[in-house]
A protein has these predicted regions:
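Bacterial Sec-dependent signal peptides at the C-terminal "C-region" and cleavage site
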Residues: 9-21
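Acidic low-complexity segments
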Residues: 33, 229-237, 243-346
Length: 480
């Protein structure tokens, strides 16, 4: 079921009610927010329509799951939003909310006749709307002015050192950081019948020459495990453990690895177009359902790029546009979004993966090979799941990029563009592609259908979604 056929629903933030015919196509019903009716239609067809088989049957089964996931992501009512916003905008009126919704700064949708807001919609408003962001920054100015915690990473100083050292040593990699990770998944009590085996996949780092090395598995719980081969583009370590009545089921993996900072000093005039029929061809093509060259994105690309033909300068144009026009905001689960780049374009916000997917798509449309990379980021004392990517410039080869970190605030041109051909040392890389099969394969739908950073859990009765288990990432910097 990992190769589920994705369904392109409307990318509109607020889905408006419409069709009411019980026999209307379930796609139309879903697009109109009539989830209960859509479910009735799907279940009826699955039960009575003998032509529903193979991929179509899997697709329809997943749409039932997708609607349930959307419900979990959209639990807030308008009053919940008002209560939060009033802390910062005391005189807020209904017309303000209407305007923010129309501008897609306040994420909502109609579900079975009731307007529901994304769980983080209110907080995101103060990331997306420029005036609200200004108010937020003024209110939190004292916090932002506080000196960094002792031992905190100075990111810009760190990447400056990487650039200086790679230039001095005349190589792309420098400033290695050795880390120890202990990752734990705790399945909540009684989510399966007692005695039933629970299957668990925990993300595990890939060995990447010169970039991520010296990976050493220290211990696991349970001791029996299956480690996926390094060639897996979404690498996992797999466990099984039987559920015990009234008790959580715990899985963990502890390991060490070393990650290197990267910087490739690009001379734009040396960069040339790649052969589209070479081994790079897969990284120039569409990958449904997300990397799709829609007419809307083609028009955007044409407008942005104009007559520029140099691949590096085209990438700069696209990188700067995403950095400036698609601010970071907390995102709903990717499995609820039919097309991530179109979501970014139409809503003008997105988290790191949504920003990255848009940039990758625009690059490929312009003949620039680009691909996904993801895992976790660390800015001691902080950490987070994070998505970034790789981009190919001839004759330099593959180099890392991070459009979320964007243009650095500096007058030094080379340092400003660091994250278009470089990466800091504080990364943990699990994935080099999207939506890849696991070893061993998962029998039921994945909780995360695109990325793989938290893990996956299931039993013979079905997938265990994120609200049925918890994850914990504990880490230590051993050497830098």
């Amino acid at each position: 079921m990992q190769g589920i056929v994705s369904l392109v629903l409307t990318a509109s933030v607020c889905w408006l009610g419409g069709a009411s015919d019980q026999q209307a196509d379930y796609r139309t019903l879903m697009a109109n927010g009539e989830f209960a009716k859509a479910r009735e239609v799907i279940e009826s067809r699955l039960l009575h329509d003998g032509t529903v088989s193979g991929p179509l049957r899997v697709e329809m089964q997943f749409e039932i799951e997708r609607m349930e996931r959307i419900r979990k992501d959209f639990t807030k009512k308008r009053q919940d939003v008002v209560d939060f916003v009033k802390k910062y905008v005391p005189n807020v009126v209904p017309q303000d909310l209407d305007r923010w919704e129309k501008e897609r700064s306040l994420e909502c949708m109609m579900i079975d006749g009731e307007k529901r807001y994304f769980n983080n919609a209110a907080r995101n408003l103060f990331r997306i709307d420029k005036e609200c962001l200004r108010i937020w920054n003024e209110r939190h100015a004292d916090e932002q002015a506080k000196p960094p915690a002792e031992g905190a990473l100075d990111l810009d100083a760190h990447i400056r050192t990487i650039r200086e050292e790679t230039l001095r040593q005349k190589q792309a990699y420098s400033e290695p950081v050795q880390m120890r990770i202990r990752y734990t998944i705790t399945v909540k009590p009684d989510v399966t019948p007692p005695g039933e085996p629970i299957r668990c996949w925990i993300p595990f780092p890939r060995e990447i020459p010169h970039r991520q090395t010296d990976i050493r598995l220290i211990r696991t719980d349970p001791a029996d495990h299956r480690l996926a081969p390094d060639k897996d583009l979404q690498r996992m370590i797999y466990f099984e453990k039987s559920a015990v009545k009234g008790r959580p089921t715990v899985f963990s993996a502890e390991y060490e690895y070393t990650n290197y900072g990267v910087h490739v000093d690009i001379e734009p005039d040396l960069v040339k177009a790649v052969d589209p029929q070479s081994a790079l061809k897969p990284y120039l093509e569409q990958e449904y359902p997300h990397i799709v060259f829609t007419d809307t994105l083609r028009e955007l690309s044409k407008r942005l790029v104009g007559t520029e033909t140099n691949p590096y300068r085209v990438a700069q144009i696209l990188f700067a546009w995403v950095d400036e026009n698609v601010p970071w905001a907390s995102a709903r689960e990717y499995s609820t979004i039919p097309n991530l780049p179109m979501y970014a374009y139409e809503n003008r916000h997105g988290d790191c993966g949504i920003q990255t997917m848009l940039f990758i798509t625009l690059c490929r449309m312009n003949g620039i090979p680009a691909r996904w990379q993801s895992g976790w980021e660390f800015q001691p004392p902080d950490d987070s799941m994070h998505d970034w990517g790789m981009i190919y410039f001839e004759p330099y080869g593959w180099v890392p990029m991070d459009v979320t970190y964007g243009l650095r605030k500096t007058d030094e041109e080379k340092l400003k563009w660091f994250y278009l051909s470089g990466m800091d040392s504080y990364r943990l890389i699990f994935n080099d592609a999207i939506s890849q099969p696991f070893t061993p394969k998962k029998d039921h739908f994945r909780s995360e259908t695109v990325d793989s950073q938290r893990g996956e859990v299931e039993w013979k009765g079905g997938n265990l979604y994120f609200d049925q288990w918890d994850w914990d990432m504990h880490w230590d910097v051993l050497k830098k």
